Design a protein with these regions (language model features):
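Tryptophan-paired
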Residues: 61-143, 211, 220-224, 228-440, ...
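Histidine-centered catalytic/metal-binding microenvironments
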Residues: 452-453
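Acidic/polar, low-complexity intrinsically disordered N-terminal segments immediately downstream
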Residues: 11, 25-118, 122-183, 189-198, ...
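Charged, compositionally biased non-catalytic regions
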Residues: 6, 23-25
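C-terminal motif of bacterial Sec signal peptides marking the signal peptidase cleavage site
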Residues: 17-21
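Flexible, low-complexity coil/linker segments
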Residues: 151-226, 230-237, 243, 265, ...
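Bacterial N-terminal signal peptides that target proteins for export
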Residues: 1-8
Length: 485
């Protein structure tokens, strides 16, 4: 269940709109619309814009304003739904110029305030209708169907949810969680509402004129923020003796470790138009599939280069609650060692390559073999020159390189690259990421050199490689501080 202090900026746009009916439809952009009394009913709808703390009851600090592209609403659709779930009336709106607050200056917010004349053939006096507002012009997989709302699904064939996060055209819909009932907005028409001076108003929890709170359908994952370029001297909690040896060795030999790229894995391909919950658990549509899956990054020895690392400033994704395919961030770092004087790879395309054997870092096979000179048949009895030649023949072919690693049980950090991964989580709801939230990972500490490939297995547990801190915002900002090992 969403908590009070987890709430996301559910509304990024704003407007006070009056919807009126008459005997003939008119252009919605007509500023003179609604001036004459007409047959039918008048109705006022308000879409509330957020203030600095968002539109929900409470938002965690720190919060973060949307960008202008994320805050603007240029298009939208109003739905009135009868007691049987039938859409009694809908109207597409365009040429809107509403926008939510984008900085501390409240003048950055522009609330819409227009009167529209709309023909309302199918609403009747005395009847109550549920009211929904969809921002953006994106369409669900089938016609909007409120019998039940669960049938309304957004889907994409792209890796990310970018079609639903277009500049000035973000898909948004009624907020629906423990704080706000997305199905709770209603309007009831009476004969008195056939006059523009007395329009029907949207009701929520008995309050007439209530604004409809909407939220973005997508979540935002920002590029990670690296705050550490050195191996930390201290040990993570509950570190084993073997891990302490590895950390001490890395601390002694690593001069610098720099974040160079990242990737996001396990991207859901669909989402409900309105956020949906089942027994207080976030629900995803049936048969949700995932692109850029974690398994597609390779295995514990093999790096499968599918060009997933993108270094984009932001990524927009659908929410996710999968335990089998959790939304995960992979980090790629470049390690620079203090002493490469006698290294096997000092020059060329693979310069900086080093090894780790039995938790100890080496720059040459000669160093390793000297340390294990008393071990019978070490490396199958092969000398350093033979091992180097064998690696030279494998290092530029990821399949051959993975076989080399596996055969000799040695970690080869090609080009000095090392990898970490971390499951992205909401600050207060375990195991999910949810819409209208920003997820930003801060790398605070690095304890050890990571894995040789993205899916390399740590010798301890996941904490052995990474510790992260997350924040969420208005957008709700989830930041997670991460320690890498």
């Amino acid at each position: 269940m969403k908590k009070m202090n987890l709430l996301v900026m559910s509304l990024v746009s704003a407007a006070a709109l009056s919807f009126t009916s008459c005997s003939d439809s008119e252009d919605l952009a007509n500023d003179n619309a609604g001036q004459a009394k007409a047959d039918g009913f008048y109705m006022t709808l308000t879409v509330q814009s957020p203030n600095a703390s968002g539109t929900r009851t409470s938002v965690l600090d720190p919060t973060e304003f949307a960008t202008a592209d994320e805050a603007a609403i240029k298009k939208g659709t109003l739905y009135l739904v009868d007691a049987n779930g039938k859409i009694a009336f809908s109207e597409n709106l365009s040429n809107l110029d509403w926008k939510g607050q984008t900085d501390k200056n409240e003048s950055s917010k522009k609330d819409g305030n227009k009167t529209f004349k709309i023909e309302v053939k199918d609403v009747h006096a005395g009847n109550t209708y549920k009211v929904y507002f969809k921002a953006g012009d994106q369409l669900p997989t089938a016609e909007m169907n409120f019998k039940p709302t669960l049938s309304n699904i957004f889907a994409t064939d792209k890796k990310f949810a970018t079609p639903f996060a277009e500049a000035e055209n973000f898909a948004m819909f009624n907020q629906n969680d423990s704080q706000v009932d997305g199905n709770g907005y209603t309007v009831t028409f009476s004969k008195a509402n056939n006059n523009e001076a007395n329009p029907a108003k949207v009701n929520y929890n008995g309050v007439a004129g209530s604004p409809i709170k909407v939220e973005r359908v997508v979540a935002r994952i920002d590029a990670p923020v690296n705050k550490s370029t050195q191996i930390l001297a201290s040990y993570p909690k509950n570190a084993s003796e073997a891990l302490k040896v590895a950390i001490d060795d890395a601390k002694e030999k690593v001069d610098n470790i720099e974040l160079v790229d990242y990737a996001v894995a396990n991207l859901a391909n669909q989402s409900y138009v309105m956020q949906t919950w089942n027994n207080n658990q976030l629900s995803l549509p049936a048969n949700t599939e995932y692109t850029q899956k974690g398994t597609e990054f390779g295995d514990k020895y093999f790096y499968k280069d599918n060009k997933f690392f993108n270094n984009e400033p932001v990524n927009y994704v659908f929410e996710n609650n999968s335990t089998d395919n959790p939304t995960t961030m992979y980090f790629e770092y470049k390690v620079t060692l203090k002493d490469m004087a006698n290294a096997d790879f000092k020059e060329g395309a693979n310069a900086g390559t080093f090894y780790r054997y039995n938790n100890v870092i080496y720059t040459s096979f000669d160093q390793i073999i000297k340390d294990y000179k008393d071990v019978p048949n070490f490396f199958g009895g092969k000398d350093a020159k033979t091992m180097k030649t064998e690696l030279d023949n494998a290092i530029n072919d990821d399949t051959k390189l993975s076989e080399f690693r596996k055969t000799y049980n040695i970690e080869v950090f090609k080009g000095g690259k090392t990898y970490y991964k971390h499951v992205i989580k909401d600050n207060h709801i375990n195991g999910i990421i949810q819409r209208n939230s920003i997820y930003r990972l801060n790398i605070n500490n690095i304890f050890n050199v990571g894995a040789q490939v993205p899916n390399g297995e740590p010798t301890e547990n996941d904490y052995y490689y990474i510790n992260v801190t997350v924040t969420v915002n208005p957008w709700v900002l989830n930041t997670e501080d991460v320690d890498l090992q």
